[in-house]
Amino acid sequence: MIKNNYNSSEAKSYIDQAGKDLADQELALRVYTSRIIGQNPDLVMHGGGNTSVKVERKDLFGNTKQVIHVKGSGWDLDTIQAPGLPGLWLDPLRELRNLDKLSDEDMVNVQRANLLDSSAPNPSVETLLHAFLPHKFVDHTHATPFLILANLQIGRAHV
């Protein structure tokens, strides 16, 4: 059984440090919960897995738009900081669901083109999975017990 390591006072500390902007507070909470996940070796192997949060931010013209912050390449969940969860404009990513096919190169180009900060790390290769799911917070882990089961000959019947 997985122990719940969430601590309300620790979470509040992360949120308080983020300032008054609601999107920054939600991102700070995502950083906190990502670290909890990343520090559990039964849930992640070598810092792997991905987390995301969907927030609202204003674009250059002052329009409120949906943004997804998703773990970037090169960051480990157990030590992640806000820059390790680059923000992307969400609507263009969701439009990709309407395509019959999408090459890896086109996917990466669309993701890079929709980063809020062009110098941010590449977002996870699973960014579209996170974007297509409706949930505000998404956790995608590489849980060791399930990976073991899935790789056994008889595993598929039990996963």
Show which residues each predicted segment covers.
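NAD(P)-dependent dehydrogenase/reductase Rossmann-like domain
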Residues: 109-137
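Short, functional N-terminal and low-complexity linear motifs
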Residues: 19-20, 95-97, 147-151
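Generic N-terminal amphipathic, Lys/Arg-enriched alpha-helix
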Residues: 1-21
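Conserved small/polar residues in nucleotide/adenosyl-binding loops
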Residues: 157-159
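Short, glycine/charge-rich beta-strand/loop segments that flank catalytic centers
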Residues: 48-51, 111-115, 143-145
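Histidine-centered catalytic micro-motifs
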Residues: 135-155
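N-terminal low-complexity or amphipathic/hydrophobic leaders
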Residues: 22-107, 128, 132
